[in-house]
């Protein structure tokens, strides 16, 4: 009796498992791009040829923002952000990282950096001359000289890196017609070029060594100042306060950078539309043009009045605008949400569908495509698709 009941339960479980819907086959014919904006837990992402040739060049620099976004969403939200929304924020973090890297070596920032370090060197030399009669019980003069050498090395590395980036950037910008090929890839290409040259660039190695040495040198200076105590402040006040100021500035910059990284992480995680709007306002048009964006189909979302009548319990229907034979698609509750702003589609809102079949709010995706022509979810390049159609 027990054996027959067990066989019955086995057959029922097998039939139930066979009747379960499978969630495979959600990609197009070439198996690269997902056709729905919300993906299963095992997500297949589009990997470019450049990324495959250098598989670790992005992971180290981007890991901090990605892990911060995941942690903040776990800790501060009522519900965990779904995987597609996290992918969008990881893409936005990469975009910010690439633009920050390019901005850090722009002409005004490089000029201010060199001017700032020259001021430190000049102040150090002046205090060393004025305090020639002071006799500290700790080798503070050695520490000040070492600090000045670090400033000189930093300025040299910045100048070399700035000139290297300019040499790499001018061939990209000077092509004229090359912008029509893929103008949105300017920042991506620059980031990939600099990452590829990192292993063979002496300036990068020297800058990394200088950074590590400056950290160790700061600890040594802090120890000497602390060990000297009140004797230093009375016997060598100029050298003492110079070291205190240099140490304090270093701490200030570290705290400032950490706080800025936290603010950026919070903004990317919680206020991504604001970040996109700021980049849209201040950045040059490096992505798709308005004409390229307007060529993509626009849809209007309509909420369903009676959900029970629809198989699959769809949340609403998106209907193509501006055509005599509009295409209609029903959206499930999981799909009826914008991955950028994390807001559910309201009745009558306009949606934009990309060639990869991912859809977003028009106001959200249009600004993103103005900055970067790649889909924020699967990184499909809409300009490449437009050129192939031509």
UniProtKB/Swiss-Prot annotation:
Subcellular location: Membrane
Composition bias, Low complexity: 1-19
A GO CC term assigned to this protein in UniProt: plant-type vacuole
GO molecular function: transferase activity; zinc ion binding
GO biological process: protein ubiquitination
Keyword Ion transport carried by entry: no
EC number: 2.3.2.27
Region feature Disordered, mapped onto this chain: 1-39
Membrane topology per record: Multi-pass membrane protein
Residues spanning the membrane: 109-129, 142-162, 212-232, 244-264, 265-285
PROSITE patterns attached to this UniProt entry: ZF_RING_2
Domain notes: The RING-type zinc finger domain mediates binding to an E2 ubiquitin-conjugating enzyme.
Physiological role: Mediates E2-dependent protein ubiquitination in vitro.
Protein name as catalogued: E3 ubiquitin-protein ligase At4g11680
Species of the source: Arabidopsis thaliana (Mouse-ear cress)
